[in-house]
Amino acid sequence: MVERTIRILIAKPGLDGHDRGAKVIARALRDAGFEVVYTGLRQTPQMIAEAALQEDVDVVGLSILSGAHMTLVPEIRKAMDAAELADVPMIIGGIIPDDDRPKLEAMGVRGIFGPGAETEAIAAHIRHIVLSSAES
């Protein structure tokens, strides 16, 4: 069986202007063999959904350091659902309080990574998500 290249969209939603972490992760995932689409700063939920659709990505990764994750994630999920991307898994990186993790997972977030997360672990988790999605 030939393994295909996993396509991931890395997006910075909302007004958060800190993009260093997103760029580091994007570069690390590219080095790990992923095809990475980086959308840049200040993306709206609709922009993220449109990019995910146009780029035919396997996973959407959000970098959220603003603390607005509980507002942004449902808006992005809604935009993705409207674009018929309900089956595209979403992961989040950023400063996410432990109390919010179960709520985000209930919204369909398939991975949450905080500061200091190992890029190898993130890549392995993404591979697992894509493989399990393909099998279901």
Q: Language-model features: where?
A:
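N-terminal pre-triad scaffold of radical SAM enzymes
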Residues: 11-15
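Cofactor-cradling patches in redox/metallo enzymes
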Residues: 22-132
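Basic/polar N-terminal segments that are highly enriched at the extreme N-terminus
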Residues: 1-2, 134-136
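Short, flexible coil/linker segments at domain boundaries that flank nucleotide/cofactor-interacting
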Residues: 1-5, 85
